[in-house]
């Protein structure tokens, strides 16, 4: 009589108890602080929600970078007294002319000092400046990565929505927000760059002339809305005296007239700059601009050294909260364009879950009937192992908070068949040994040993495919790969460990004369 391996018994009990504890939140409310509380995280197609594919407008970012670089070059050329003319930004490059060939060498030295990765193409007295290919790729990756983080902060400022954000291709971002019933809100907060800047108002400019297109050099015309919803224009200095990147907090509030405002505070550097601006420009107006639209242009009555203030405007409570959220999250490095939009209602997700349950239940019952009909008691053991495999899958999905999608349910159903396939392979090998006239114990041991290598090879091959699907796939394909991987691991454990243990217990304590396979 063989001895049962104690490590198998111990391992099986521990894994099963642990799986029950992890899977419990899917069936009932767990109040104990010592037990897991997370149920399976349902994907967009099961829970409903919003699906957006965003395009990062890298060309706009690059053009703005070139404009900033052009301003830096002008400043350095003036300081070093280098003569130039016709310095313009065109097609993501800077073009200029030097007045004499002798000025090319010091000009190149300045350019290399500012940014060594700028490529200078010289044609007689004309120079074209552009970024190298490697620098462009680095900038693109940086902009997309920053955009993903800022989108995450805007969409999930409270940390409860669990959005899915993935980079697709070179400059696309996939955003999925399960349970989001208001996609227009998402589009609104993502459609704004939220670049907050402070400018001094050009008090000497003629508004009427500026509206006609005659804007003074170094200034620009911005439009705002008055409390009566009438448009008005203000000419402001192009120079940004303070940026929104120095903000630390922003929140909706009310002024003394019970009007909605946005209260803000700067960091130490921002507070110092803000204090100097208000101290040196008392009596002048300071324009607060968001995405080139004027929010307000209050008159500076005196030095503000506390580093805080309010933004007034034609705000509702909702719009003030929205602006505060955008300012807290930070400005996007580049505008985002929505190139694909899908909205899935909760009822459709519920229908998908119900369909998945029916398909899984029908498949499970069909497999159980087939196994009992084909292999008798051993088929029953395979069904028990299959049930435990499903429990392990549910527990692992809950434990790791892997997102379960409709293709993921298909992956689980697929692993049900694979789990039983492993048992079928083992039982057929046992049957072959029994035909040779060997004992039950020898047939069982040899059947498991000879089938193990085949089962391992086939499952490893499938795991490699699942791994590749996860690496190169997106969205639902990743969900399928995750469910398939968890299913394969669970089914292998149940087929090789659980089934073998159940058969060993049956053979040892019930001593059957026949295994029911011949």
Swiss-Prot record:
Keyword vocabulary terms for this entry: Cell inner membrane, Cell membrane, Membrane, Protein transport, Translocation, Transmembrane, Transmembrane helix, Transport
GO molecular function, one term: protein-transporting ATPase activity
Gene Ontology process terms (BP): intracellular protein transmembrane transport; protein targeting; protein transport by the Sec complex
Membrane topology: Multi-pass membrane protein
SUPFAM superfamilies given in the database record: Multidrug efflux transporter AcrB transmembrane domain (SSF82866)
Keyword presence, Protein transport: yes
Keyword Cell membrane found: yes
Regions crossing the membrane: 9-29, 361-381, 384-404, 406-426, 452-474, 486-506
Cellular-component GO terms for this entry: plasma membrane
Classification via Pfam families: SecD_1st, SecD_SecF_C, SecDF_P1_head
Major location (coarse): membrane
Subcellular localization, as worded in the UniProt entry: Cell inner membrane
Stored NCBIfam families: 2A0604s01, secD
Complex and partners: Forms a complex with SecF. Part of the essential Sec protein translocation apparatus which comprises SecA, SecYEG and auxiliary proteins SecDF-YajC and YidC.
HAMAP family according to UniProt: SecD_B
Described function: Part of the Sec protein translocase complex. Interacts with the SecYEG preprotein conducting channel. SecDF uses the proton motive force (PMF) to complete protein translocation after the ATP-dependent function of SecA.
Similarity comment: family membership: Belongs to the SecD/SecF family. SecD subfamily.
Protein name: Protein translocase subunit SecD
